[in-house]
Amino acid sequence: MGFWSNLKDKLFGTKEERIAKKQAKIEAKEQRQLEKELIKKNKLNTYIAGLSKSNSSFNEHIKELQNKHNKIDEEFFEDLEEMLIMSDISIKLVQIIINECKKEVRNENITDPKLINEIIADKLFTIYTSNSVVDTTLNIKDNRLNVILVVGVNGSGKTTSISKIAKKLIDEGKKVLIAAGDTFRAAAVEQLEIWAKRVGADIVTPNENEVDPAAVVYRAIDIAKSKKYDILIVDTAGRLQNKVNLMNELAKINRVLASKIPDAPHESLLVLDATTGQNGVIQARVFKESTPLTGIILTKMDGTSKGGIVLTIKDEIGLFVKYIGLGEKVDDLAEFDLDSYIYGLTKGINE
């Protein structure tokens, strides 16, 4: 073996070692790709399972429609319109979907009702993404205390949603503190404490006789700053009976946050129960008037057969769903993915 061969072996290893290293790199890359594909598959399976009721209802109604009609005509579109409204899609959106379907049917000269399935799925997708970029990420940055304000009525799944988001952030290596700002319900504070302990988050609760949510938030900010937390998640009261009180409470919390942390809150998320349908849209309007909102957490999607509420919220409230509840387990609160949602909702209609 010559000098240069020896020198190369010293610097870069023997030929066999170089081949082994190269093979190891290839295997590591393949492993990473496999892990990515597995995560994607698991996410899709979560959507399919969580949307099974909506999917079953959607498929059933589409097939009923196709069995009833031999051709695509005005009567067919009237029945399709009724079906989409029954799926909790707003009347305004349904009219847009119907008009778009009519255009495509006319342009492609389609007469068989069985050929319209893919068109419907495509229109659901394009309407959701029209005039805006779908953004489901949380506004979280390094080297600052990130504040997430969470609002919603009692019983919407607010407590569990806060805990599940905390768990996701903790799993990402973030240090998370929860402020129990629903001071009007002792049971809500106790439940949040139990969940915080379960997911490994710290929590600030009201002191004895402390009924002002803003005071709890004030203390929580000081603790979060002094102990270098990455995330502060603020729970709030969910009383809609008195809109003026609700607006005043949220306004005061927002003032406290802004005075202590520039640009806070960085996220203001509204928790809505998907099973409430159009009532959820009414709730969203009230909360939007009470505090600036950045996104929606849509819970209990696994419990409804009307999956169209996602589209209605975006159209009528102008907010994207950032998280969607697809089951009771901690990992069943998923970051909203439009592709997986449309697939989970319409899976099987072309089979």
Swiss-Prot record:
Cell compartment(s), UniProt: Cell membrane; Cytoplasm
Pfam families: SRP54, SRP54_N
Gene3D superfamilies given in the database record: P-loop containing nucleotide triphosphate hydrolases, Signal recognition particle SRP54, nucleotide-binding domain
Membrane topology: Peripheral membrane protein
Predominant location category: membrane
Biological process terms in GO annotation: SRP-dependent cotranslational protein targeting to membrane
Catalyses which reaction(s): GTP + H2O = GDP + phosphate + H(+)
EC number(s) from the headed UniProt entry: 3.6.5.4
Gene Ontology terms: cellular component: cytoplasm; plasma membrane
Residues bound to GTP: 152-159, 235-239, 299-302
GO MF assignments: ATP hydrolysis activity; GTP binding; GTPase activity; signal recognition particle binding
InterPro entries: AAA+_ATPase, P-loop_NTPase, Signal_recog_particl_SRP54_hlx, SR_rcpt_FtsY, SRP/SRP_N, SRP54_GTPase_dom, SRP54_N_sf
UniProt keyword list: Cell membrane, Cytoplasm, GTP-binding, Hydrolase, Membrane, Nucleotide-binding, Receptor
Subunit and partners: Part of the signal recognition particle protein translocation system, which is composed of SRP and FtsY.
Function summary: Involved in targeting and insertion of nascent membrane proteins into the cytoplasmic membrane. Acts as a receptor for the complex formed by the signal recognition particle (SRP) and the ribosome-nascent chain (RNC).
Alphabetized PANTHER family for the sequence: SIGNAL RECOGNITION PARTICLE RECEPTOR SUBUNIT ALPHA
UniProt record similarity statement: Belongs to the GTP-binding SRP family. FtsY subfamily.
UniProt name for this protein: Signal recognition particle receptor FtsY
